[in-house]
Regions:
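Structured beta-strand/loop patches that form or line metal/cofactor-binding pockets in enzymes
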Residues: 1-47, 51
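Metal- or metallocofactor-binding catalytic centers and their adjacent structured scaffolds
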Residues: 39-124
Length: 125
């Protein structure tokens, strides 16, 4: 039986940033990231991470109910449901001036897709 997602956790993290290694340039001496951890019904963990920020964190937290309980094998359907919710709730999701994409939706979908694919790969192995 294909595992189901039993839990989605979102961990905002911050740390010191080395400005010489930051592709986005010297904006601040720190970084923020959102780490998403999905647990499936087999007890396995899938992990993903994306840039931080309150909008991204809030959108991830708002997506928990759409992800929890879904089948790992139907990850594309899960992502479609999350995208539909984002399309309704995130106004003016525009690209920023920095060299990385600041659109909330792009990062939220990536933060969920990466651990789903992590779990799918473990299941198919």
């Amino acid at each position: 039986m294909v595992p189901r997602i039993t839990k989605m956790e979102v961990f905002p993290v911050a740390g010191r940033d080395c400005m010489e290694l930051n592709l986005s340039g010297a904006h601040a001496p720190y970084f923020t990231r959102n780490v998403v951890v999905l647990t499936d019904s087999s007890g396995l963990l899938g992990v993903g991470e994306v840039p931080g920020g309150e909008k991204i964190t809030k959108a991830l937290l708002d997506s928990i109910d759409l992800v929890a309980g879904t089948s790992v094998g139907e990850y594309k359907n899960t992502l479609v449901r999350v995208k539909e919710q984002l399309d309704r709730s995130v106004a003016e999701d525009v690209r920023g001036n920095q060299t990385f994409d600041q659109r909330t939706g792009v990062h939220v979908l990536t933060a969920i897709e990466a651990p789903l694919l992590d779990l799918l790969g473990k299941y198919l192995e």
